[in-house]
Amino acid sequence: MLTIADRSFQSHLIMGTGGASSFDTLEKSLIASGTELTTVAMRRHAAHTGAHGESVFELMQRLNITPLPNTAGCRTARDAILTAQLAREALDTSWIKVEVIADDTTLLPDVLELIDATETLTNDGFTVLAYTSDDPVVAQRLEDAGAAAVMPLGSPIGTGLGILNPHNIELICSRATVPVLLDAGIGTASDATLAMELGCSGVLLASAINRCINPITMATAMKHAVEAGRLAREAGRIPRREHAVASSSFEGLASWADEVL
């Protein structure tokens, strides 16, 4: 069970809607992934791209998926705060994924603006899920500012490079008292599994599904990958060793010398 603030979800996979090739493919991918929480970028108008003019928000309502509006594209805390307020009024939700981007080339978080936005929105009654860098100190500052979940990147958005700094992700997980959701950079199922093995509570991804060759098949793979990583973490991996350790006992082993005698 993934618990964030006052809500719980069976699935530990959060899916994004950005980059989907078609409305129909998005719908089938959402179903295949098993996600119960899905991010949508807030804009001044909602795109109606379904066959019958159905919006993404109406699709999620039909599929019983909780929408998580985000502030994608915002460059300042002020813009992120305004976008969150518009989302609350439009969607009647106080949940918001806060992104404050430093520049359009790297799409890396501006952590100073992010912390400012997180604190202000938390004080205004929002449940903030904060997209951040893989810096453990920044993650702690966001938690101190009131974030209900911290969302460190594995690698820059859309790169598919996987988790470039697993040590830092594991360190963030070990120190956090709120859920840690790996966000950005996932390229394939093994990346999602690793995130959960490192101790993440969940994984958010969009491009890895929406921009791959077969999104529906990849959505299914990601569903199982996240669950596999979670179970592996709970089971506990064997310790790493410098030397080989036999898995079978040598007691009673037949040898040629014994047979000759």
UniProtKB/Swiss-Prot annotation:
Lineage start: Bacteria, Bacillati, Actinomycetota, Actinomycetes, Mycobacteriales
Enzyme class: transferase
Entry binding sites for 1-deoxy-D-xylulose 5-phosphate: 158, 184-185, 206-207
Known EC number: 2.8.1.10
Stated role: Catalyzes the rearrangement of 1-deoxy-D-xylulose 5-phosphate (DXP) to produce the thiazole phosphate moiety of thiamine. Sulfur is provided by the thiocarboxylate moiety of the carrier protein ThiS. In vitro, sulfur can be provided by H(2)S.
One example of a Gene Ontology biological process annotation: thiamine diphosphate biosynthetic process
Gene, per the UniProt record: thiG
GO cellular-component term (any): cytoplasm
Subcellular location(s) of the protein: Cytoplasm
Reaction equations catalysed: [ThiS sulfur-carrier protein]-C-terminal-Gly-aminoethanethioate + 2-iminoacetate + 1-deoxy-D-xylulose 5-phosphate = [ThiS sulfur-carrier protein]-C-terminal Gly-Gly + 2-[(2R,5Z)-2-carboxy-4-methylthiazol-5(2H)-ylidene]ethyl phosphate + 2 H2O + H(+)
Listed SUPFAM superfamilies: ThiG-like
Record's keyword terms, sorted: Cytoplasm, Schiff base, Thiamine biosynthesis, Transferase
UniProt-listed PANTHER family: THIAZOLE SYNTHASE
Catalytic residues as annotated in Swiss-Prot or TrEMBL: 97 (schiff-base intermediate with dxp)
The protein's annotated pathway: Cofactor biosynthesis; thiamine diphosphate biosynthesis
Record's protein name: Thiazole synthase
Family: Belongs to the ThiG family.
